[in-house]
């Protein structure tokens, strides 16, 4: 435990092996918070006849050029203000979230929209680790609208 704690505080370790210093609790945190809350909300809504469609979370990457990687690492350190978060760790956390959401959709029979498979890129698409530029928000909306139409719904464009 002491060695892992030391690694979490090491900038060299974060830059060279970021996934090895991501806290082991990340998967459990994803299951306990967003996935569990969405499961509860979705079940309540479904019990009232609401059809459920869940879209994945997009994140920068999967491959970034050096300048984008520097920007997203800086952004992670500046905004998250902890010793283990950088672009690779944030990307892994989003991947864990998407895995949890997709699994939830399959187990509950809900429609899954993997927007993260379509929305990729660097600073031309993402303002930071979490937020899209306006053109990418429209892109995401089109992906969701297409999924709604494919599910038998309607979408106004």
List the model feature ranges, each with a label:
Residues 34, 111, 125-157:
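Histidine-centered active-site loop/cap adjacent to the catalytic His
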Residues 51, 109-111:
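Conserved beta-strand segments of alpha/beta enzyme cores
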């Amino acid at each position: 435990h002491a060695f892992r704690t030391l690694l979490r505080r090491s900038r060299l370790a974060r830059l060279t092996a970021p996934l090895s210093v991501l806290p082991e609790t990340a998967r459990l945190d994803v299951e306990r918070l967003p996935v569990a809350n969405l499961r509860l909300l979705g079940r309540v809504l479904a019990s009232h006849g609401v059809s459920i469609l869940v879209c994945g979370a997009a994140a920068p990457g999967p491959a970034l050029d050096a300048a984008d990687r520097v920007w997203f690492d800086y952004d992670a350190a500046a905004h998250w203000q902890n010793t283990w978060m950088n672009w690779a760790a944030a990307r892994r956390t989003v991947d864990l979230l998407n895995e949890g959401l997709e699994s939830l959709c399959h187990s509950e029979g809900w429609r899954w929209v993997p927007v993260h498979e379509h929305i990729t890129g660097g600073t031309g698409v993402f303002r930071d680790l979490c937020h899209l530029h306006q053109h990418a928000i429209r892109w995401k909306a089109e992906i969701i609208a297409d999924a709604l139409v494919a599910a038998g719904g309607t979408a106004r464009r």
